[in-house]
Amino acid sequence: MNKIDHKKLQAKPEEEDFSGKYENSNFVAKYLVENYFKSVEKLIALTKDVNSAHEIGIGEGRSTMRLKHLLTNFSGSEFVEKLVPVAKKNNPELNIFQESVYELKSKSNSIDLVLLLEVLEHLDHPEIALEEIKRVSKKYLIVGVPNEPLWRILNISRLKYLKDLGNTPGHLNHWSKKEFKKVIEQNYGNVIAIESPIPWTIILAEKY
């Protein structure tokens, strides 16, 4: 795989604000987030013989906090260096470190379950990222992205990001459920199950 020059990427995660991403006090937002994590938990329950798990792109580690009780030998990583200490503080018992999804530090075929939640839509090269994830993955991938165009429609309905037609800042990729299933099948493996909590698509796939 060709080395990615991060300085030339359109994605600028270090400039985005991920604070409070899963901590919204709004009733509707809270309800949607709860459904989101219930769906992730359902997919985790479908996996077998998972003795190691790693979440990529954890931000402040909020999703990691929600899921760590379900997984053994669980670790996490984040590209933005200033967020790594925050994620460590939120998950002091876990191995949290800095890495790029394009240059993962794990050995090939070493992780039973990789999680990538609300990351792929931010990437310049999602296919290259999936290729690298496939390298380190031994069995499973759980990956979630916004379900388009529903995501943008809901943003417009609440008068958000109107000048960008409802596109959330930092979102470079937009997939419907059908389109995203095809991306995963072409770049990772067999799709075992799909959850569609509004307004996301979350897929459990097994490596080819």
Predicted regions and their residues:
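A conserved beta-strand element that flanks and buttresses the S-adenosyl-L-methionine
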Residues: 115
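Conserved N-terminal segment of class I S-adenosyl-L-methionine
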Residues: 1-108, 130, 159-188, 193-208
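Short "lid" loop at the C-terminus of a central beta-strand within the Rossmann-like core
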Residues: 147-151
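Hydrophobic adenine-recognition pocket in adenosine-nucleotide-binding enzymes
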Residues: 119
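A short, conserved alpha-helix within the catalytic core of class I
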Residues: 123-132
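Short aromatic-enriched loop/helix-cap "lid" or pocket-rim segments at secondary-structure transitions
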Residues: 152-157
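Conserved beta-strand signature within the Rossmann-like core of class I S-adenosyl-L-methionine
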Residues: 138-146
